[in-house]
Amino acid sequence: MLEKFMRRRSVRTFSPEPVPLELIENAIRFAGSAPSGANQQPWRFVVVRDAELKRQIREAAEVEERENYEHRFPEEWKHALEPFATDWHKEYLEIAPYLIVVFRIDYGLEDGKKIKHYYVQESVGIATGFLIAALHEAGLATLVHTPNPMGFLTRILDRPVNERPFLLLPVGYPAKGVTVPAIEKKPLAEICIVR
């Protein structure tokens, strides 16, 4: 298992080849099994396959990303991104067969009353990690995309006020012949301390 997951890489070039919805649904079922604060499961996974919605998301994301690359990002951040040859153009948001938009549910709404959710950020982060692992296990590629600010996702996907975008995952098979930057993960000695 370790060997397989050490080969996982983010992909920005997807094949338009259809992906069975069942693979996506099973990955989300797995993500939904993640632990959460007080078992409140404060997440929503919105699966987008409609071409028009994907177009709207791409256009809105590119507006924010262009602003980020041209005005918001500090030079050192742009320099850190250079090995990945990324910029504000996000064609993959339309090419990937699916977009999974992960929302964090900051509080519950029951009979018009707010119900506090605990450890929302941590819980949604864990569930998203489960989701990425399940997608990889299913033979699918993905990329964590956070076009900040992300409020346009709430509007386009018609989500309620208590749900906030956490991140966006384009999902599909990698394009044939796609290459990814040669990167290394830190060795165990750098990430683990045993006392």
PLM regions: where:
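Glycine-rich phosphate/pyrophosphate-binding beta-alpha loops
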Residues: 32-39
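Glycine/small-residue-rich phosphate/adenosyl-binding loop
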Residues: 47-124
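Short, basic and Ser/Thr-rich N-terminal targeting/leader segments
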Residues: 39-42, 86, 94-96, 164
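Short catalytic-loop micro-motif centered on adjacent basic/acidic residues
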Residues: 13-14, 44, 141-144
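C-terminal helix-cap and adjacent tail motif
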Residues: 3-11, 167-195
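Short acidic N-proximal helix/loop "leader" segments that mark the beginning
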Residues: 1-18, 22-29
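Small-aliphatic-rich amphipathic alpha-helix that forms the alpha element of a beta-alpha
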Residues: 27-32, 100, 106-156
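A glycine-rich helix N-cap at a beta->alpha junction
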Residues: 66-73, 158-181
